[in-house]
């Protein structure tokens, strides 16, 4: 990278890196640095009347207060921050004081990683700190961190632009308090869920991500191409059909926690790549699954928050079991006044028009009902509510209701106005399943690009016999949002999907050389703001010469300064 492409701070840090090497100090050492303590644990276990505890810690410098022969710095490790007291004569016990006077005071910067060996003590101001006796450079930071200042728990000069935070999550995690805690809670949520499923005796499995048929859900898939086989493949939209094959194969219960992909919109609650847990258990039904789910979520909430309640967007949500259960058609009648039971597709389409909804001819009966529920009902369910007994047209993989014709044994769990889970008494009648797939094919031919494909191998598996089974899918990302009080899905994804970062257009050196400009002057011209030769067209020759001369001197480029006449010739050549 050319020197002129760097900021002044970056240049200073690179110079410091080279000076460290000249002193025989490797700024990126390869050897293991052994630590025996962390900031949080040091503070929690400190006792004033105990013998001074020797510690070896490491972390990132987050602030410094440099004085004369003694200074302070704040070190951030994986658990938090701790103050370190640096005394010149303690870290430099002999005549050579360079470690303090040069390395610490001049060549180290905020953002650098160092190792400290010393002992724990309490300062006169009452702060538990580490008294350094040895300092080791572990990694030199070449870019300055944004400095976020905190006073009374309020951040100032914050690194808070959402796009920057999501693109540079590595910076966000370092400088913004509380961000890392979200992802530690995410890990705890998944760990608690996995532990509960393992304790229940269910087997964690892995199924294909690349699939020849995008089945298991109604969604638009991502398509890719396998060069060796010369076939199109789909990134899975769900794990359902493969997991049910394993139930056919004799597993009592199977689950998978993994990524699914849906080529659909992005908003505050949707990301095209998302994490889902799917579970299938033989000899169970959707009533059992509702009971299992509410107990599981209550356990997770207590494990993460210490209580069965979570707060999000000013609302307190109780995950204390049991949850309310409400049939979907009753929910629609309750919110819109329309009773859809027994209505035909044409009658429901007419109701949609009366409700002034935007619909189109590709939507079948199930899609129309789904649109009504989504627009008028879904957002009203704040406390956990099982919406149950969906019409068969909305549920191509679900068993028919045992006592309610035209309905299925399916539920969706609504929390804070969004779907968190989807579950069924699974359809295990292969003939019925084939008819449902054919109906989905009809919808696909009608133009519904979210209709399911016919999976002949899955039908073949069902024909060998699948026991009565209940299954559920829980959206992990939305669950983390609920448990951590976040209102956007991007806040619970370490690296959410984003548009490619815009790059500044720059002409290559050849275009400048064609104007008669020496190649060695190109970086200086671009540093001065002339990123393309076209930008030179209206330049003032005298002003440009002054800028180039200043850059030549400031950065010690040692170039022969151009004359005004030479620059005028460059500008004239742009128009030719």
Swiss-Prot record:
Keywords tagged on the record: Aminoacyl-tRNA synthetase, ATP-binding, Cytoplasm, Ligase, Magnesium, Metal-binding, Nucleotide-binding, Protein biosynthesis
Subcellular location: Cytoplasm
Enzyme class: ligase
Protein residues bound to Mg(2+) 1: 412, 419
Domain of life: Bacteria
Cofactor binding comment, as recorded: Binds 3 Mg(2+) ions per subunit.
SUPFAM superfamilies: Class II aaRS and biotin synthetases, Nucleic acid-binding proteins
Enzyme Commission code(s) on record: 6.1.1.6
Matches recorded under InterPro entries: Aa-tRNA-synt_II, aa-tRNA-synth_II, aa-tRNA-synth_II/BPL/LPL, DUF4332, Lys-tRNA-ligase_II, Lys-tRNA-ligase_II_N, Lys-tRNA-synth_II_C, NA-bd_OB-fold
Record-level Gene Ontology MF annotations: ATP binding; lysine-tRNA ligase activity; magnesium ion binding; tRNA binding
Keyword Acetylation annotated: no
Entry's Gene Ontology BP terms: lysyl-tRNA aminoacylation
Disulfide bonds: none
Required cofactor(s): Mg(2+)
Predominant place of localization: cytoplasm
HAMAP family for this protein: Lys_tRNA_synth_class2 (MF_00252)
Subunit text: Homodimer.
Family per similarity comment: Belongs to the class-II aminoacyl-tRNA synthetase family.
Record protein name field: Lysine--tRNA ligase
């Amino acid at each position: 990278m050319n020197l002129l492409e760097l900021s002044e701070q970056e240049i200073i840090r690179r110079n410091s890196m080279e000076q460290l090497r000249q002193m025989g100090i490797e700024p990126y050492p390869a050897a293991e640095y052994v630590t025996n303590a962390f900031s949080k644990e040091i503070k929690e276990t400190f006792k004033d009347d105990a013998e001074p505890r020797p510690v070896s810690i490491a972390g990132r410098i987050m602030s410094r207060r440099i004085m004369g022969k003694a200074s302070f710095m704040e070190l951030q490790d994986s658990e938090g921050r701790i103050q370190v007291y640096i005394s010149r004569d303690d870290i430099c016990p002999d005549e050579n004081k360079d470690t303090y006077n040069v390395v610490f005071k001049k060549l180290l910067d905020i953002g650098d990683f160092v190792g400290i060996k010393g002992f724990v003590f309490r300062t006169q101001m009452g702060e538990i700190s580490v008294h350094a006796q040895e300092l080791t450079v572990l990694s030199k930071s070449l870019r300055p961190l944004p400095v976020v200042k905190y006073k009374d728990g309020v951040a100032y000069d914050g690194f808070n632009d959402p796009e920057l935070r999501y693109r540079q999550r590595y910076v966000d995690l370092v400088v913004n308090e509380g961000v890392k805690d979200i992802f530690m809670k995410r890990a705890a949520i998944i760990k608690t869920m996995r532990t509960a499923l393992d304790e229940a005796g269910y087997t964690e499995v892995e199924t294909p991500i690349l699939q020849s048929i995008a089945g298991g859900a109604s969604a638009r898939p991502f398509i890719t191409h396998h060069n060796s086989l010369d076939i199109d493949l789909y990134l899975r939209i769900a794990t359902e059909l493969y997991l049910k094959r394993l139930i056919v194969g004799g597993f009592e219960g199977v689950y998978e926690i993994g990524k699914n992909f849906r080529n659909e919109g992005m908003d505050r609650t949707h990301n095209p790549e998302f994490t889902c847990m799917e579970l299938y258990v033989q000899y169970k039904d959707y009533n059992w699954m509702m009971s299992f789910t509410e107990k599981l979520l209550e356990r997770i909430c207590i494990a993460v928050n210490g209580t069965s309640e979570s707060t999000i967007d000013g609302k307190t949500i109780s995950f204390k079991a049991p949850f309310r259960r409400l049939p979907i058609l009753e929910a629609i009648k309750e919110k819109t006044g329309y009773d859809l039971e027994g209505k035909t597709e044409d009658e429901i389409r007419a109701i949609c028009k009366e409700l002034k909804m935007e619909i189109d001819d590709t939507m079948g009966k199930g899609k129309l009902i789904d649109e009504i529920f989504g627009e008028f009902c879904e957002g009203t369910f704040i406390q956990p509510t099982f919406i149950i007994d969906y019409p068969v047209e909305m549920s191509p993989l679900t068993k028919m209701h045992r006592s309610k014709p035209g309905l299925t044994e399916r539920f969706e769990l609504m929390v804070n106005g969004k779907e968190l889970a989807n579950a069924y008494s699974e359809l295990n009648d292969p003939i019925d399943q084939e008819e449902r797939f054919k109906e989905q094919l009809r919808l696909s031919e009608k133009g519904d690009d979210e209709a399911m494909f016919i999976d002949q191998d899955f039908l073949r598996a069902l024909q060998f016999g699948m026991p009565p089974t209940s299954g559920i899918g829980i959206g992990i990302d939305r669950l983390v949002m609920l448990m951590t009080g976040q209102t956007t899905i991007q806040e619970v994804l370490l690296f959410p999907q984003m548009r490619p970062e815009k790059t500044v257009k720059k002409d290559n050196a050849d275009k400048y050389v064609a104007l008669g400009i020496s190649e060695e002057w190109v970086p200086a011209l671009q540093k001065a703001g002339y990123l393309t030769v076209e930008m030179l067209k209206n330049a003032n020759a005298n002003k440009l010469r002054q800028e180039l001369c200043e850059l030549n001197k400031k950065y010690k480029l040692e170039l022969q300064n151009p004359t005004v006449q030479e620059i005028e010739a460059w500008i004239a050549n742009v128009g030719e």
